Amino acid sequence: YHGAPADLRDIPLGTFLHVRSFLPPDPKTSVVPVLPVNSKDEAHGYSGKGTRPAENHVLLLEDEPSHCLREGKVWKLMEVELKNNEGTIKARREPAAGGDATVEEETMSFDADIRIWHGRERITVKDLINEGIWPKNGKQTLDGQAVQLGITWKPNYGNEYDHLYVSDIWLDDAAMLHATDLQTETHRAPCAVVGCPPGSM
């Protein structure tokens, strides 16, 4: 989480996560439910498809910035549209070393409570508006500014259950490193009390 080890309790509900997992062992010896291999293709009520995968033994669970840092990728901000301190961002996830013409542009929403990080400081949408970086209302091109994004899911009563929101923007490497350091200390603190397995730090 944020590029550092984490417990599940460190990760807010709704955080968009990437997972690497595998099928359980022999159903006769598995201690967890064994689902049909194609269960992820079945729709379950309002949840849609993909909510009950058969691969329920997890090797790696990571949030968006951790995934991008591990794979050497960044989000390139293409456009922002604002109205009343909330709006949408258009962005592309690309290799940090260079663009990828095959990557599709994503449109994600954000609210006034979005956390924007610059160095060791948290700033707001209003700060970006006052500095002339973002418009007060309307659209503005962002010319592929490279950032890291925290992505989350929120209830949407317009029936867009798969629509994503941006929870955090780290504007530079210093901001991301600071977030990683903070999460590292959050993870270490309980270990100092209860102890952790060797190598888990």
Describe the residue ranges of each PLM region:
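Short, flexible, surface-exposed loop segments at domain boundaries
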Residues: 1-201
